[in-house]
Amino acid sequence: MVPHITTSISDSPLDVAALIGAAGSPEAGGIGVFVGTVRATPAQPETDRAVVRLEYEAHPTLADETLRALAHDAATKWDLIRVIAIHRTGSCELGEPTVVIACSAPHRAAALEACRWLIDELKTSLPVWKKEIYSDGSSWI
């Protein structure tokens, strides 16, 4: 079976429900989902400043290629039916989704394992950079 893979680096707000729905399939026994959102606590716990929003920048071509390759690797390794992997760029407000990963498979274990692997790989290898914005300044993470 050839998996259906959808990836994107997007400067538009993410429609989480639509993206999860797109991962569904009559052959799927489960969909593993991860939704990353903007939180008020900073990445560095020693920082006592609250995050107001995040700003993401990406290397457009390389980020697209990397995300697609990671999604393909996950689909192959776990025999997935569908893979959705979308990452935001631009300014993102508190609570706003910044990344959506949805993997469907015949059985839940594969869907969940693939989803976990994909977000972990994305965090270490995707050329997307994050800046925390505070009320009194900013910091690249």
Predicted regions and their residues:
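Phosphate/diphosphate ligand-binding glycine-rich loop within oxidoreductases
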Residues: 101
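N-terminal, polar/charged subdomain of small-to-medium soluble alpha/beta proteins
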Residues: 1-98, 106, 110-141
